[in-house]
Amino acid sequence: MKRSISIFITCLLIAVLTMGGLLPSPASAAGTKTPVAKNGQLSIKGTQLVNRDGKAVQLKGISSHGLQWYGDFVNKDSLKWLRDDWGITVFRAAMYTADGGYIDNPSVKNKVKEAVEAAKELGIYVIIDWHILNDGNPNQNKEKAKEFFKEMSSLYGNTPNVIYEIANEPNGDVNWKRDIKPYAEEVISVIRKNDPDNIIIVGTGTWSQDVNDAADDQLKDANVMYALHFYAGTHGQSLRDKANYALSKGAPIFVTEWGTSDASGNGGVFLDQSREWLNYLDSKNISWVNWNLSDKQESSSALKPGASKTGGWPLTDLTASGTFVRENIRGTKDSTKDVPETPAQDNPTQEKGVSVQYKAGDGRVNSNQIRPQLHIKNNGNATVDLKDVTARYWYNVKNKGQNFDCDYAQMGCGNLTHKFVTLHKPKQGADTYLELGFKTGTLSPGASTGNIQLRLHNDDWSNYAQSGDYSFFQSNTFKTTKKITLYHQGKLIWGTEPN
């Protein structure tokens, strides 16, 4: 009996810690396929990165800071936490060449090897980054680069999760045709003698912004991609125009470095601009890696000063940038794109017409995000035109600016509309509602919208107290609720508004 009680208490404790974000979610439990087990050898098809089955893959992850400075954050424990809690599928080991990096201290390559070995064990992809920066012309240390990549490719040529990035950010008096392309041809030749298949990423001019130049004079190798780097506070539509041009020319792009800050790595964070960039990358299925995993006191860092070097970070140890990046990786994990859950059947004797089912994507009463998941179902006998239907989720924001994201919708996130409405007179459990609408679509009798997964957060990423919100309740399965209201052409047709 005592043993049974002990087991029960242990299970309860694990459940509480998991809900509180102190332990990895069940999605990371043993038995779940790792990214590499699922996708295997990567290759290029057109402009797309594809897996062994030829299906498009979008990798998302984070980069180390310079290994010579912040290498202590790069270890198996931290990468495991990033895989299990953040959901990363790729990690970038940024080995600076100058500034106390490989050229002055070749032993820093041992940290690269540690990262690769950890990634192999954990089943995630890893980018070996020859991180030129102040030494802006890649030819300055070309022979050292060839020496380094000869060693790396001889070690990992049969390892499908390795990706080579052979010139981080060429800059200064450097151009593609004269400097970067000839360098790349020589280094690629060295790698291909040992590794015929793995992806190679080549930096482009002006700190890896001139993908348009590379697109006009592409390398011959079939599995080469071109690096695009941006910082949300500095770079905008003009750089996306360059990316669009490169894609139109058939040049595959990998964003191996981007930051929520300005180009200095400090200043900001610029979350609206970051969101605009990530929406763009998602629309093109472009893989990305965020800068950076460190506790350096600058806005692009993911961790606050003094955070653990081995993972296990509570949300309070994450910076605004780290919180944003974590949620944008977690929100698009493969688990949200599997076959949608089948909702429980409505009781047709009680629920005529259109109804709502809900579950809490984040059941914590104190959380920096609200994640309602909805099904809207037609229980009636007539087809419903969704463009005439809106749903309202009622909650308290306490005068904070609101942000909306759609993590997944069976009918497509692009088919949704939304607006936040502040009540002139607060009601019980609500001073605001989110109104969700639809651009197109119909629901035939008995049909459902399928799973709609939403995510809301305050501008400053502060916590909500969800326990007081009218529409919120803790449920990890879909349940019918009348506290999320439905309207047809503005007229209430389902549920009860708060008093």
UniProtKB/Swiss-Prot annotation:
Cleaved signal peptide residues: 1-29
List of catalytic residues: 169, 257
Entry EC no(s): 3.2.1.4
Enzyme class: hydrolase
Catalytic activity from the UniProt record: Endohydrolysis of (1->4)-beta-D-glucosidic linkages in cellulose, lichenin and cereal beta-D-glucans
GO biological process terms held by the UniProt record: cellulose catabolic process
PROSITE patterns: CBM3, GLYCOSYL_HYDROL_F5
Residue numbers binding substrate: 65, 69-70, 96, 131, 231, 263-264, 291, 296-298
Transmembrane parts of this sequence: none
Domain of life: Bacteria
Biased amino acid composition, Basic and acidic residues: 330-340
Molecular function GO labels: cellulase activity; cellulose binding
One Pfam family, short name: Cellulase
Renumbered residue ranges of the record's region Disordered: 330-353
UniProtKB keywords: Carbohydrate metabolism, Cellulose degradation, Glycosidase, Hydrolase, Polysaccharide degradation, Signal
Residues of the CBM3 domain: 350-499
Family membership: Belongs to the glycosyl hydrolase 5 (cellulase A) family.
Protein name: Endoglucanase
Organism: Bacillus subtilis
Recorded name of the encoding gene: bglC
